[in-house]
Design a protein with these regions (language model features):
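Catalytic phosphate/nucleotide-handling subdomain of diverse soluble enzymes
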Residues: 3, 17, 102-149
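Short, glycine/acidic-enriched loop or turn micro-motifs at the edges of active sites
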Residues: 7, 98, 128
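Active-site/ligand-binding loops adjacent to catalytic centers
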Residues: 2-90, 94, 136-149
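Substrate-binding/catalytic subdomain of NAD(P)-dependent oxidoreductase enzymes
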Residues: 91-103
């Protein structure tokens, strides 16, 4: 499953067509899922996923039905990253946290359907350079851990 942010859904809502790989239109045309090179994505926590198109290779896999594409929202990504940090002690990059969110979705479905599955995901980077992403989660964690006086 290829996972992307809801705010930049090239695989799930884009068009499979030739488009430029850059916003200036200087690169060769690439066959990919794209929102159009004129699409200006919002500023999001996962800068590496803030792009108008998807990889031509991943796009071809999705187009031919070999890979499924899903999108996840920011809040679900924050919750998944926080849970992963608290349970596994690993500070995942925001981009990787999209995969973690989708993995949690798949695990919940498997549990509800009483299926035992092996679910793998790619943790492609740490979040040590993305501490601002985690700062957004701290108030929620502190609120959960505080003891009323």
């Amino acid at each position: 499953i290829a996972v992307e942010p809801d705010s930049c859904p090239s695989l799930t809502r884009g068009t499979y067509t030739y488009d430029s790989g850059d916003t200036a239109g200087l690169t060769p045309q690439l066959m990919m899922y794209t929102l159009g090179r004129d699409f200006i994505p919002p500023i999001i926590h996962a800068g590496g996923l803030r792009y108008h198109g998807a990889s031509p290779l991943v796009s071809a896999l999705v187009h031919h039905g070999l890979v499924e594409a899903q999108s996840v929202g920011d809040e679900e990504v924050y919750q998944a990253a926080s849970l992963f940090l608290e349970t596994e002690g690993i500070l995942a990059a925001p981009e990787s946290s999209h995969a973690i969110a989708q993995t949690i979705r798949a695990a919940v479905v498997a549990r509800e359907e009483e299926r035992h599955e092996v679910i793998l995901f790619n943790l492609s980077g740490h979040g040590l350079y993305d501490l601002a992403f985690y700062d957004r989660m701290i108030p929620a964690r502190v609120a959960r851990q505080s003891v009323p006086l």
